[in-house]
Amino acid sequence: MLIVTWDEFNLCVESITNTCRDKELCGVYGFPRGGICLAVALSHSLNIPLLQEPKSGCLVVDDVYETGKTLKTISENKKITIFVWFSKSKPQWWNAVNIIDPDEWIIFPW
């Protein structure tokens, strides 16, 4: 079991911010529920709008990539930048701050 803290959350936000700072992003969208916390924090740190739905040219975030079902819904849009905090498989068309074992259970701070 992996128990993550708010300090680790802040490091994740900092990592994504540093990677995306120079990108021209129209906003950030977070998949409900886990991606919303990341999206709000990144909206503030990148000074971009929080979006109610993903659109071309935006940053899309989620807490974890497991089966790919959630992110697959937007994977066809090549103009979207996708980040997850934890990925349970090697990133292919998305970005991950951390890659973990597929069997790992994650306890988030929220």
Where are the model-predicted features located?
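PRPP-associated nucleotide enzymes
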Residues: M1-W110
